[in-house]
Amino acid sequence: MNELRLLGPAEIRDLAELIGVAPTKRLGQNFVIDANTVRRIVRVAGVEAGEVVVEVGPGLGSLTLGLLEAGARVVAVEIDGRLAERLPLTVAQLAPEAAGRLTVVHSDALAVTELPERPGRLVANLPYNVSVPVLLHLLERVPSLRSGVVMVQAEVGQRIAAGPGSKVYGAPSVKAAWYGVWRTAGTVSRQIFWPVPNVDSILVGFERHATEPGDDELRKRTFALVDAAFQQRRKTLRQSLAPVYGDPAAAGAALEAAGVAPRRRGEQLTLADFVRLAAR
C-alpha cells in the first residue's frame, strides 16, 4: 500500500483546537503524536490489506490512518461525539482514497453488542481507565475477533499477560486467558503521547483460542470464582471462596472435589483449575 500522510504533533494539536477538544482524564484520552509508533503498532499487529479491523478510541485519527495505510477496513468505535464526527472528515482530507474503508460507530465500547462488519482483529490505543473492561467486553460480544494488539498502561498490560505464580497475576490475567493466549509485545515511550501521561505504556497481543473452555454459563461461574479468589489475595481459597459456597467448610469440600488444595491461594491457580472448580 502507498504511504499516507500520518498525523504529527502539530496536526494533532491543531485538530484538537479546531473542534474544541481538550484531552480529559475521565475518558482516558492521550493522543498518539508519533507516526513511527503508529506504523510499529500496525506492523506488530500483523494487519493485512482487505481485512476488517476494529479500533476502540480512535481519537483524532493517528492510528486509524496507519491502519488504513496498511489497507485494512476500519470500524472505529468512539465515545466522544466531536471526535466521532470529525474522524471521517480528517480521513477524507488526508487519505481520500481510503475514506470508503472507514466506518465510525459513535458509542461507548462497553455498550457495543454488535458491529457493522465482522472484524477479525482488534488494534487500539485503549483508554487507560477502562482498558481491561473494554477488552473483556469485546472478546465476549464480538466472537469474530481472532487476534489483536492493544496499547495499554504498562502495569495493566503486564497483569493481563501474567501467568500463575507471578506477583502481578490476578483476575484480569485469568479472565483474559479464557479467551486466548496473551503476550507483551514491547514498551512504548510516554513521550509519543499528547498530553504526556504519568505512566508508561506497553503493547499486548493476543491470539484467540480455537474453542473456549466452556459455554457462557460456565464462563460466568468461573469469573465469579476468580473475582472472589482475588478479592483478598492473601487469604487461602478455603477462606476467600467461603462467601460463594456459604462457609469455609463447604468451600474446602468443593476445592478438594475439584482436586485443588484448600490452603492454596488464587494466584497459584491456572484458568483450568478455576474452570474445573466452576464445572462441579
Swiss-Prot record:
Domain of life the protein comes from: Bacteria
UniProt subcellular location: Cytoplasm
EC number: 2.1.1.182
One term under GO cellular component: cytosol
Enzyme category, top tier: transferase
Key word rRNA processing present: yes
Catalytic activity: adenosine(1518)/adenosine(1519) in 16S rRNA + 4 S-adenosyl-L-methionine = N(6)-dimethyladenosine(1518)/N(6)-dimethyladenosine(1519) in 16S rRNA + 4 S-adenosyl-L-homocysteine + 4 H(+)
Covalent S-S links between cysteines: none
Residues reported in the UniProt entry to bind S-adenosyl-L-methionine: N30, V32, G57, E78, D108, N125
PROSITE patterns, per database record: RRNA_A_DIMETH, SAM_RNA_A_N6_MT
Molecular function terms from GO: 16S rRNA (adenine(1518)-N(6)/adenine(1519)-N(6))-dimethyltransferase activity; RNA binding
Signal peptide: none
Keywords: Cytoplasm, Methyltransferase, RNA-binding, rRNA processing, S-adenosyl-L-methionine, Transferase
Function, in words: Specifically dimethylates two adjacent adenosines (A1518 and A1519) in the loop of a conserved hairpin near the 3'-end of 16S rRNA in the 30S particle. May play a critical role in biogenesis of 30S subunits.
Family the entry assigns: Belongs to the class I-like SAM-binding methyltransferase superfamily. rRNA adenine N(6)-methyltransferase family. RsmA subfamily.
HAMAP family noted in UniProt: 16SrRNA_methyltr_A
Protein name stated in the entry: Ribosomal RNA small subunit methyltransferase A
Originating species: Leifsonia xyli subsp. xyli (strain CTCB07)
